[in-house]
Amino acid sequence: MNYVVDISDPSASDGSVTGGKGSNLAKLVRIVGKENVPHAIMVTTEFAKALLNNEKILESVGELDNKLTEGDEKTAEKIAAELTEEIENMRVPKELSKPLIAKVNSMKQHARRRRVAVRSSGVTEDLPTAAFAGQFETYLNVPLDSNVTKYVLKCIASAYGWRVVDYRNDLRKKQLLDISEADLVKKGVMSVIIQAMIDSDRAGVAFSIDPDTGNRNVGVIQAVHGLGEMIVQGKENAPWTAFVKRPEPRVLGTIVPSNPQKEMLIFDSKTGKNVEVPVKADNPKVLTSDEAKQVAEFTTRIEKAYDKPMDIEFAVENGKVHIVQARPETVHGTKAVLTLHKLKEQPRIRPTHTGIAVGTKIAVGPVVKALDHVEAKRQVETQNRKGIRPILVTSMTTPDWEVVMDLEKISGIICERGNRTSHAAIVSRERGVPCAVSVSNALRLEDEIKVTLDCSSGEARIYSRVLQFEVQEVELKELPETITKILVNIGSPNEALKVSQLPSKGSSLVRIEFIVAGTGMHPVFALKADKLGHDRWADDMKQKYSGIRSLSQEYVERLKTGISIIASAFLPRDIIVRFSDFKTNEYSGLPGALHYEIVCSCGKSISLSKQDRCPTCGSKKVECNEIELEFVENNPMLGFRGASRYVSRLFAEAFNLELKAFTEVHKLSLTNAIPMVPFVRTTDEADKVTNMIRKCFEESNLKIPRIIFMAEVPSICITPRKFAEYCDGFSIGSNDLTQLTLAIDRDSEILAWEFDESNPAVKKAIEMLCEGAHSMRPVRSVGICGQAPSDLGKDFIKFLVIHLDSIGVNPDKVVETLLVVKEIEDELRDFIEECDKDSVKISRELAISEANADYLMRKLFDTS
C-alpha cells in the first residue's frame, strides 16, 4: 500500500490517490518539466483512509450526514468541530508514520532551504464545478526538522472545518456533488502535499481565459513583488498582463493600477515568519517581458494538455518561473448562456465610489458593513430575516466569510482592498455574486443606505441610490445569419472582453478615448517631457509617472495594450478602431495640457505644478512659465478635431504616437484592427492623413491596412467618389452627420426636439454616400457606427439594410437588431422576386435610386 508517493510517481497524477490539487501538480511535471515545478511528496488518500478507519470517527461522520440531510446546521457544525479536533490529536500508527518520515527526510536533498509547504489536497477539490478556494489548510515555511506529521494531521482535519462542510453541502443542494460525507471517508477524503518552498522574488496567478467574462481568446496574468500570499490576500493592487494564445502565445501588454504595490511579503529567516517590507524594485509591471512570456507559454501549454480553461499559480525566483499549482477554471468552463446586465438609463449622478469590477453584473441593496466574518454573519442574517439581501461592505475577506458570500444571502459585496485574484474575487465570481474590490473608502458608505453596484461596464461603480437595470440572457447557440453585418460599438478593453462574445461580426467602432484618458498624459506634453529628458522632470512628474523613463514610449505602450486586448477579444473578426476624437475642451482635461516650464541658468525643466525653484539644480533664480497646449474654442464640435488636428504641425508628431501604437498591434499579428479617421472635411486632409498612415506602416515593414473614413461631414456624402480615392470604406457617424446637415448643435437642449437622424435630408446624404461608394471599383464598403440604429425603430433599420453593408449598434441591441434585420432581409428578398428583380420597379417602389436598387439586389442575391 502506497501511503506516500513522490511527485514523479505515475500514481501521483491520479486524483483518487493524491486529490485534486496533488494530481494536478503531478501532471504539471509532465507538461512543463520537472525543473519548473518545485519538488514534492504526497501523502495519499490511502493514508487518510487508514487513519480515519476507526469506529468513533466513522460514527461521527455518519451523524454529520444525518444532520446535514435534516437541515440541522447548528448540530452539524458542532459535530464538524469535534471531528476536526479529534483528527488533529490522533496518534499516527507506525505503519503510516514510518514511510512518511522516510519520505520527509528524502526531501532534504530537494528543499535546499530545509523548509516546505504542507498543503491540503481534497478529493473533491479543484473540480470543474467547484474551486474550494482557500478553504482547506495550508502551512508555509514548515522546517523539515520539525514535526511535519502534525501539519499533515491538521490538513486532513481541515476537511471537516465547518466552512468546507457547509460548502460541500451547498454543492450537493445544487446537484454539483453527489457523494456523502461517509462515502468521502471511504475514498480517503484528503491527500496532503509536502512541497519545497520557493522564496519568490515575484509571484502570481494566471488564467488561460479572462476570469470575469469567460473570453477564451485572452488570458490574464497578475503578479506581485515578493511571496504570492500577498496577491491571494488582496492586500495590494496587482497589475494585470493580457496575452493571446493563438497561433502562439504573445503578450499583449500590462495594465498598471493607479496605486501600485507598496508593500511586499518576504520570509524572515530570523523569526521564521513571513513579514511585510517596502517594495524596492522600480518596476510597477512586476514581471519582465521574458517572464510574462514564459508564464503565458506555460499557461497555454497547460490549458492545451487539460483541454479546458485553467487557473495556475506561479513563483519567480532568480529569474526562473516555477509553476506551483494548476486547477480547472470553474466559472465559465460549461457556460451555455451569456447574461448581460445593463442600466436602463444613463445615470445623471456621478458614482460615489469606483473600483475593480469582478464579473459583469449589477446589484441593488442596502449597505451593511462588517470588519470580521462573525459580525458579517450577524448583520446579514438580521437583514435576511426581513427578506432583504444586503450589499456587504468590508475591508477584505478570507475563507471564514464564505458562509455569507452567497446570492441567497447577499446581493453583492464591496471590498476596500483586493484585486481580480483575491479571495473575495474568486469566491464571488464562482458563486455569481456581483463584487467590487479595491474600492477606496468604501467603509465610509452610510449604514443601510440603498446603493447600486454596477459592474457591467468593466469598472465597478457604486451609486448612492437605486438605479433600475435590466438583464438580457443570450443563449450561446446559433442565431440566424444575416447578409448585412451586425457589428457592435466598444468603449474599453474590459468591455470588449465581454461584448465580443455576442453574436456580432466584429466591432463597428472602437473608441480609444477611454484608453487615451487612461494614459494619464497629453501626448504633446509626453513628447515635450521626453525631449527635455527624465533628469529635467520635477518631482511631481517623477512621482506621478514612477518607474517610467519615457512618457511617449509609455503612451504608445498603453495604447498598444488597450487596442490589442480588444483586437484579441474579437479574433478573427475585424474591429474598426477610430483614432482619438477628443475636442480641444476634452484634450485640455488631460494631465500635461496645462504644465509649467521652469527656466534656469542650468537649462529648462518641466512640471505639472508651479515651482519656485529649479527641479534640477535647486536654484531659486528661475522663471516659471505656465504653458497651455490647447486653446479655447467657441464651438469645439466644429473646431480643431479629427483629420484637421492629425495633419496640423501642432499635433502631427503626437498623432504619430497613435500610428506607432497601431503598427505595434499589427506586429502582434493582430491585423484585424482596422484604422478609422474621424471628421474628414476635405480631400486635401484625406490625402495628407492617409499618406501619414501609409508611411508609418511602410517604415515598419508592415502591409498597409484598410483605411476607413468616418462619414460625418456632409462634404463626404456630397462628393463620395473623390474621398473614396483615399480610403477603403466609410462608416457613418449619425450624430455628427445630423448635426452638420441640419445645423443643430447636438448638445443643444433647446433644439433637441428637432435633432432627428431619420430626417429626409440626413437620409438623402446617406443615399448619396452609398451610391458613390458602391459604384467604385473595387467597391467601398459603407457601414454605420453612430447612435441612430440603437435608438430608432424598424423603419430606419430597413432604410439601413437597403443601403448599407453593416450596421453597428450598442451591445444591448445586438441580438434584437440581428433578428429584426433577418426579418427585413427576408421581406426584401420576397419583394424583389415579386418585382422580377427589375431595378427600375424596385427603385420606384422603394423610392431609391436605380444604382442603390442594383446594389440591394447584388447584396441579397449575391449576383455579380
What is the predicted function of each stretch?
Residues 16-50, 116-148, 197-240, 310-333, ...:
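Conserved phosphate/anionic-ligand binding catalytic regions in large, soluble enzymes, centered on
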Residues 41-94, 251-260, 266-268, 439-467, ...:
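A structural-propensity feature for long, helix-poor, extended segments
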Residues 41-64, 266-267, 271-273, 304-347, ...:
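Terminal amphipathic helices with adjacent charged low-complexity linkers/tails
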Residues 54-58, 324-338, 352-510, 514-531:
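Acidic, glycine-rich flexible loop/linker segments
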Residues 111-112, 122-132, 201, 299, ...:
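Conserved alpha/beta-domain cores
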Residues 126-128, 138, 151, 157-162, ...:
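ATP-dependent carboxylate/acyl-activation modules
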Residues 179, 219-311, 315-318, 533-538, ...:
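Conserved catalytic alpha/beta cores of large enzymes that bind or transform nucleotide phosphates
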